[in-house]
Amino acid sequence: AQYGLLGSIYAKSALGLEKPRVAVLNIGEEEGKGNVQAKATYDLMKADTRFNFVGNVEASYIFTDKIADVVVADAFVGNSLLKMGEALYRINHRLGGKIPSLRKMLRPLLGRIIPKLYWQQDFWDAMNAESIGGVQVMGVNAPVMIGHGSSSPRAICSMILSMERDIKSNFPEHLRQALKEA
């Protein structure tokens, strides 16, 4: 449940979402779905009233805003999804940005996991490690970000811009306040 709270606070502070929808990544949307860990996470998050928990979300919806703004997953699954997104970006880049060709190629493999969003540049920028730069570690005293060891100058610049956004949004203070109320 703590990751749901952290994600919700970050989405409010840094991304400007008024009431972010938080969900657990699972194999189905129904409450009883998933393994023991997913079911326990669901129960903990459902009981936590500090954020807007909307239930489970299937992987086919994580690249859309139809169900959730914040998706909570274990480290193995979350990192696997991150790597998949990076791979999709590299495939599209190698094809020269020929997104319709990529869509035609991937459709039989991934079904509907890649939505209409697929044509939009913002979607591809979000998959590009160079555009994002790194990942927020949710520092309580100050924003902390981790990047790849092989980060390029562009990725480092993107990381600095992300840190600037996090500092201007006063994210650490919002996080401290929420944790005091816990």
What is the predicted role of each segment?
Residues 56-65, 128-129:
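Glycine-rich oxoanion-binding loops at beta->alpha junctions
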Residues 1-59, 69:
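Glycine-rich phosphate/diphosphate-binding loop of Rossmann-like nucleotide-binding domains
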Residues 67-71, 75-182:
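Glycine-rich phosphate/nucleotide-binding loop
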